[in-house]
């Protein structure tokens, strides 16, 4: 790898790691927040939803900025914003303040994804992008493991507020990003070409033709399902484990680490299948696998079987996360790549984020089996949509889209 490639993958992996650490802080703090503020499960679920709404807003703004002013500047801005909002949670002692800060954190985190994926796509060969986006996504899982370890120590001794102080660490990353990363020649050429031919960078480019509109909306449905499954499971699985097995926060953190390891292994396998065979093959295997393995948790009644169930669920449900950035980056032109990645993924985050609220209601009104049936059905819907998208059938032989489809 070249020096810039090394810094690209290191910076994006670190950025996703710190972003995921912030998201998982909420997962582990959710039960203590409910207890300390005396709120319902539905109100607590809305905390995660506010984060995802912020991601939609931030993704829209920073996606456009990433295509207009450059990936590097935009990437550093997004990291700084979510770091500030996360650290400020230390001073939050009421639900409205928590909602506001999580929305602000979402703005920064939402902007980061598309810019990071664009950086990877523009600095590596097409045949490497699936694996490289998976490596960056694995960085996110490292952040989740660090969050689990931190939560197991900090929450019992210092309370949930103190956990969020670690959120200021990403500020350090912005220095290294601005100092060591440089824009790719592919981006600079595409930007110059767009300016020369007076092509505007706007959301309407994603809906320029009927086929492109169908592709964009279909990918949005898939990301909605991905985020609904991930946030729904990650925000509530620790609580489910604590309730079903009577585990403490510390022990449930160990269980979560096993789940996250499963996710990381899934990302490695997914990236390999995608680059070796095709995006369609990789997504087909993992979407069907996700729909099936969710029910394993119903039969898990010991610590060991819960760990194995968690690893399998993590392997399939989040193994494909990095694949979305790789697919979107190859289906849309370089000059709107950041916009496409951020808008599509963050529409998924905004709508899929409501799964935290919906699952809270399902858990309160029904049982775990109904909740798993709901999530399993979503994965099957995503599988059907993926089969209908013509872009997936062509993806193996089309390195990068240079023009919008007719």
Model regions and ranges:
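Extracytoplasmic gate region of multi-pass secondary transporters
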Residues: 27, 210-267
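Helix-breaking motifs and short loop linkers at transmembrane-helix boundaries and internal kinks
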Residues: 38, 70, 91-97, 125, ...
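Conserved MFS/SLC helix-loop-helix module at the cytosolic interface between two early adjacent transmembrane helices
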Residues: 57-93
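Helix-loop-helix hairpin linking two adjacent transmembrane segments in secondary transporters
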Residues: 136-179
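A late C-terminal transmembrane helix in Major Facilitator Superfamily
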Residues: 331-365
């Amino acid at each position: 790898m070249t020096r810039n490639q090394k810094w690209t993958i290191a910076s994006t992996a670190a950025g996703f790691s710190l972003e995921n650490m912030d998201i998982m802080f909420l997962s582990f703090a959710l039960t203590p927040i409910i207890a300390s503020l005396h709120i319902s499960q539905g109100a607590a679920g809305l905390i995660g939803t506010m984060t995802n709404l912020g991601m939609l807003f931030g993704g829209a703004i920073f996606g456009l900025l990433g295509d207009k002013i450059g990936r590097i500047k935009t990437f550093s801005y997004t990291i700084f914003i979510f770091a500030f909002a996360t650290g400020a949670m230390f001073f939050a002692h009421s639900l409205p303040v928590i909602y506001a800060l999580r929305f602000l954190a979402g703005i920064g985190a939402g902007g980061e994804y598309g810019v990071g994926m664009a950086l990877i796509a523009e600095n590596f060969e097409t045949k490497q992008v699936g694996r490289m986006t998976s490596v960056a996504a694995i960085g996110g899982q490292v952040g989740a493991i660090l969050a689990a370890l931190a939560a197991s120590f900090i929450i019992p001794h210092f309370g949930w507020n103190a956990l969020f102080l670690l959120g200021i660490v990403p500020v350090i990353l912005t220095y290294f990003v601005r100092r060591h990363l440089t824009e790719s020649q592919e981006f600079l050429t595409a930007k110059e070409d767009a300016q020369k031919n007076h092509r505007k960078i706007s959301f309407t480019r994603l809906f320029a033709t009927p086929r492109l509109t169908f592709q964009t909306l279909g990918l949005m449905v898939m990301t909605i399902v991905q985020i609904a499954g991930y946030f729904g499971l990650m925000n509530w699985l620790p609580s489910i484990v604590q309730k079903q097995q009577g585990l403490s926060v510390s022990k449930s953190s160990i269980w979560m680490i096993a789940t996250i390891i499963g996710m990381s292994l899934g990302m490695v396998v997914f990236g390999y299948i995608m680059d070796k065979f095709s995006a369609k093959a990789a997504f087909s295997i993992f979407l069907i696998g996700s729909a099936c393995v969710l029910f394993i948790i119903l039969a898990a009644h010991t610590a060991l079987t819960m760990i194995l169930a968690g690893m399998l669920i993590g392997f399939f449900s989040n193994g494909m996360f990095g694949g979305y950035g790789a697919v979107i980056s190859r289906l849309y032109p370089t000059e709107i790549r950041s916009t496409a990645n951020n808008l599509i993924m963050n529409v998924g985050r905004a709508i899929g984020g409501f799964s935290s609220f919906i699952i809270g209601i399902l858990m309160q009104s029904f049982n775990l089996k109904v909740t798993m049936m709901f999530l399993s059905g979503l994965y099957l819907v995503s599988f059907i949509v993926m089969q209908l998208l013509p872009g997936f059938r062509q993806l193996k032989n089309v390195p990068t889209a240079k023009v919008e489809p007719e």
